[in-house]
Amino acid sequence: TGTPISNSITEMYTMQRYLQYETLRKNGLQHFDCWASTFGETVTAIELAPEGTGYRAKTRFARFYNLPELMNMFKEIADIKTADMVNLPVPKANYHNVAVKPSKFQQDMVAELAKRAERVRARLVEPYEDNMLRITNDGRKLALDQRLMSPMLPDHDDSKVNACVENVFRLWQENSDKKLTQLVFCDLSIPKNDGNFNVYDDIRQKLIARGVPADEVAFIHDADTETKKKELFAKVRKGQVRILLGSTFKMGAGTNVQDRLIALHDLDCPWRPRDLEQRSGRIVRQGNQNDEVHIFRYVTENTFDAYLYQILENKQRFISQIMTSKSPVRSAEDIDETALSYAEVKALATGNPLIKEKMDLDIQVSKLKLLKAN
């Protein structure tokens, strides 16, 4: 597996229970509470609140303790090979974080989400009337495009969607001679052909209006059989279809169209680090004829995007402690490069320069700790 721990620290315990239950039993670690108190520690930190406004103190599993023992035990059942050990010939990825300003409506709506969240927390509404899941979903949609909240709203010029169209078109134009291709990932607002507004059709129409031939823009959702998928992928590999839009679920693992890929665009942020990894794995891959590729991540400032990247950063932090070629330190809280890049995106999305400064200082401290540990 490429992602033994995809979402939560507890997956490590589950993996061990399946594969080395006897070892756990001998060490008195067969119950999760014992395992957790031996190898994990809860850390309280100031985090962004889910609705995108304000902060809260949150206690979570964030640190592994006694890592050498944990890893020695884990390595009885696992061989770990990371990308830096295998050293495959893959292109160098350049990351571009694109932060856009929210519209007046988006700002008002974020404040409204905050009020709703307060009501839910204070138990003033029944769960069937409103709940954090619903607020979270609205927050994600709002950060992507305000028209997802109401199709009557105007198209905001500085939206993520328009910033993405701008970049996609520019790269399409610049690389026309080589017929280089691009992927756009978006898990929300997929095309349903029901006449309602969706981001996919919006992007396609805008690209066609700028002069991109209609047959060069495709949706993964149109290829609804394995045969159609194979045909579509072949077209992308040849450079006949040069812009392909899809969701992580449909266009993640198993999508091998890397041959001419020059850029990948993350229009929204998934819940799990492995999903973001699956996305970038489409382009940073053996068999790509380009030496350098570009990965764009779009965030709307002061919205739910900040919270999502924070979640990814927290999850990536402990995954990186396990999936590493380096020898384990006694206690690990050191963030790795992937977690750092999520932190930067999060800082951008908060729109508060002091938060950015705090992130930068945290990152510096992390790097100094790393140097000290080495």
At which residue positions do the language-model features occur?
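Conserved helicase ATPase motor motifs in RecA-like P-loop NTPase domains
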Residues: T1-S8
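Conserved helicase ATPase core of P-loop NTP-dependent helicases/translocases
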Residues: P213-T248
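Inter-lobe coupling linker of SF2 helicases/translocases
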Residues: P4, Y18-P154, R170, I295-L370
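Conserved strand-helix element at the start of the C-terminal RecA-like helicase core
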Residues: L124-M132, D177-D201
